[in-house]
């Protein structure tokens, strides 16, 4: 396959450590995507939820963080949401809010943020 130097280096490091690279050893993934898949694998998460090259690295990160927190990522693991929108939905789930009130891809993330706070969400940044 055709991998750039950075991706090839990451894949070689993982192979050297005896780790499985089959999930992301695909030229369709860029460095940021490989990093998020690798982090998910290291954290023991089911990366099959986001190991799709159609998700960008930021979207993958938000899905990974939700999985790590035990959240229902199906509420936002959808390409129609950008990573900032996913973040607001993830934080709403973390605050146990009814995210259906602001899970609309037509809303910009700032609008989602304000709605989340109105519903009692924290100003949480993680």
Predicted regions and their residues:
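General marker for long, soluble alpha-helical cores
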Residues: 1-126
């Amino acid at each position: 396959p055709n991998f750039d130097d950075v991706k090839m280096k990451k894949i070689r490091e993982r192979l050297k450590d005896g780790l499985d690279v089959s999930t992301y050893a695909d030229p369709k993934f860029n460095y940021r995507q490989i990093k998020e898949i690798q982090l998910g694998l290291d954290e023991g998460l089911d990366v099959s939820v986001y190991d799709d090259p159609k998700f960008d690295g930021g979207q993958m990160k938000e899905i990974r963080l939700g999985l790590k927190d035990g959240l229902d990522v199906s509420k936002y693991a959808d390409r129609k949401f950008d990573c900032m929108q996913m973040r607001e939905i993830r934080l709403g789930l973390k605050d146990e809010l009814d995210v259906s009130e602001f899970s609309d891809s037509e809303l910009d993330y700032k609008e989602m943020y304000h709605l989340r706070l109105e519903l009692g969400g924290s100003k949480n940044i993680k």
